[in-house]
């Protein structure tokens, strides 16, 4: 599957790396690498991480034993230009990559003013893309209004919105509202992959229904 106008080819499932980091399960680099490697060997080629997750070393360790193609998305809460530049370079450095495929404004709970408040960080991502440090500029969000807003922001290539069958974590609307926003973004040729299809683990006993709910949204290219 291809992520919108960015043209980045990814597997239908995306491996979200957050749970293995210190913010959640806090497993060792070695153990985390083993789990990531299993995912890669099973056919997943798309990893989603972030500066705040402290999991770059887990990914780097896994990739030492893997020669296939891997697409990596990361993100940062940086608001200013220089801060975001360091975040992008840090990701390349710690994961030993020449470039990061997708780099997001990490904006989970921010409102539609995010693009104004973080204009410096966004300008930096645009420059990093021109310089080849990243391949695509994105935003990760829990808010319906931010997805709608991002659809109209030319610089944004990829949107990573929260969506699950019970609406866990969605800000400012229902799952149906979020799907409408996703459709608008898709019409604007944005690449979209779904965040928290299992509601951060709350829907673990309903895995099949939860994954299928998101898979049936035609405008979603991959599911994390």
Where are these regions (language model features)?
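Alpha-helical scaffolding within the catalytic cores
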Residues: 1-2, 56-57, 84-90, 144-145, ...
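N-terminal binding-site loop/beta-alpha segment at the start of enzyme catalytic domains
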Residues: 1-70, 124, 130, 213
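Structural preference for beta-strand elements that scaffold enzyme active sites
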Residues: 2, 10-14, 45-46, 69-73, ...
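Acidic (Asp/Glu)-rich catalytic clusters
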Residues: 4-10, 41, 59-69, 89-98, ...
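Active-site mouth loops of central-metabolism enzymes
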Residues: 18-30, 73-83, 111-114, 203-205
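Short, acidic/polar
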Residues: 25-39, 81-96, 141-149, 205-213
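Active-site groove signature of glycoside hydrolases
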Residues: 92-113
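Beta/alpha (TIM)-barrel catalytic core signal, keyed to glycine-rich beta->alpha loops juxtaposed to Asp/Glu
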Residues: 108-224
